[in-house]
Amino acid sequence: MVALSGRVFGKVDMATANVLVVAPDAAFGHSIAFALESGGFKVVLHRYVDEAFVSPDALDAACAVVDDDAIVDWKRSRELFDSFGKPVILLLNLLRSAPDLPVAKHLTKPFLGEPLIEAVLNVIAGQQ
């Protein structure tokens, strides 16, 4: 059991849990990073899924938070997400429908920080 900001959560060491944040819009990416860092996570930013999931940062990531605009080729999304091999929280625009991606939990934009932090905690804990 590990404490994160005074909370105990499963067997995951949240103090060292890296979250890969993928968003092409720098301001949005930094906003997501700020919310997650305030929840005690370490964050690594990338602009697009194709580069993020093959980067050295992907090896140390506990999960990824991906803006739907960061997916250049939706036809390859399942292959990319499967190759990442870790849980993904997919931030979806209200009007976009995503293909069925078993490793992805959907969170509709816009959202507040707390639902995102809870989603990250839940997907990381689900890996154990």
Regions found by a protein language model. Give the residues of each.
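Non-catalytic signal-transmission and effector/linker regions of two-component phosphorelay proteins
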Residues: 1-39, 50-53, 112-128
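Conserved phosphotransfer microenvironments
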Residues: 29, 60-85, 93-95
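Short, structured coil segments at secondary-structure junctions
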Residues: 39, 84, 101-102
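Residue-level detector of anion-binding/catalytic polar loops
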Residues: 42, 87
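A structural preference for short, hydrophobic beta-strand core positions in alpha/beta folds
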Residues: 45-46, 90
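Acidic, metal-coordinating helix/loop segments flanking the phosphotransfer/catalytic sites
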Residues: 46-63, 71
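Alpha4 helix (beta4-alpha4-beta5 surface) of REC/receiver domains from two-component response regulators
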Residues: 76, 90-109, 118
